[in-house]
Design a protein with these regions (language model features):
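Cleavable N-terminal export/targeting peptides
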Residues: 1-45
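N-terminal carbohydrate-binding/catalytic regions of secreted carbohydrate-active enzymes
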Residues: 79
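Outer-membrane beta-barrel transmembrane domain signature
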Residues: 31, 35-37, 48-62, 70, ...
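Extended, low-complexity, charged alpha-helical tracts
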Residues: 111-115
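Short Lys/Arg-enriched helix C-cap and helix-to-coil transition segments
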Residues: 108
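Conserved beta-strand in the GNAT
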Residues: 91
């Protein structure tokens, strides 16, 4: 309960501050899992970093935190995750960023990763996004080829479709497929509400809201 209270206070404070900022009609990418867009000039030579932590409150199971760190320079994309494929399991990734478009902007990053810990394997994966008007689709996925037992190989995916009515707020739907914890659904569905202020993103998710809902609270920082 203390964790939920602290998160609620943080969201309230950021939301009140964000309301005081001027808004525009231009859509802003606020998804915590999005890949930084490719830009021209000197910006392409600079590193950009993003760190996030997802706190999972799973019914009839243990709570856990899933951190992710990304680093991008020019087209190069590097990423590290923990507690994503399985608990007590890390993964390291390398990929290349592609992107383009104006009214319909797109990004796509094919990746290859190594998984180590309680689960070990090789994983081809991807991240991608589409942005149009105030709508954004973000998706990522990977297939883990388990090197200990081929029967444990698995496809993981996470996708979000969100609408940003103002530049600091987004609402939408989310789906995921994971074997990190058990539910009655192979593909979990839910809703999201996110706010952004400067370099900070805060997002709340609820999966399976009609049957033993799982709550996820995410915080992200770009630098």
């Amino acid at each position: 309960m203390r964790l939920l209270a602290l998160i609620a206070v943080a969201i309230f404070l950021v939301a009140n501050t964000a309301r005081a900022q001027p808004t525009t009609n231009a859509p802003v990418s606020t998804a915590t899992n999005s890949t930084p867009a490719l830009t021209g000039g000197a910006d392409e030579k600079a590193w950009s970093f993003y760190a996030s932590a997802y706190t999972y409150l799973v019914p009839d199971s243990r709570e856990y935190v899933q951190p992710t760190f990304t680093a991008d320079r020019d087209g190069l994309h590097l990423e590290a995750r923990y507690n994503y494929e399985a608990l007590n399991t890390g993964s390291a990734w390398a990929g290349y960023n592609f992107g383009g478009g104006e009214k319909l902007a797109w990004e796509f990053t094919p990746m290859l990763g190594g998984v180590f810990g309680d689960t070990t394997g090789i994983a081809p994966g991807y991240k991608g996004s589409l942005r149009w008007w105030k709508l954004e689709l973000d998706t990522e996925g990977e297939y883990v080829f388990d090197t200990r037992s081929s029967s444990d190989s698995f496809f993981y995916t996470w996708s979000e479709l969100s609408l940003a009515p103002v530049d600091w707020l987004r609402i939408g739907a989310v789906v995921q497929r994971t074997k990190l914890y058990k539910t009655d659904f192979d593909i979990q569905r839910g809703f999201l509400v996110g706010i952004s202020f400067k370099r900070v993103d805060l997002t709340a998710y609820v999966f399976n809201p009609d049957d033993k809902p799982t709550f996820v609270f995410a915080v992200g920082l770009s630098f």
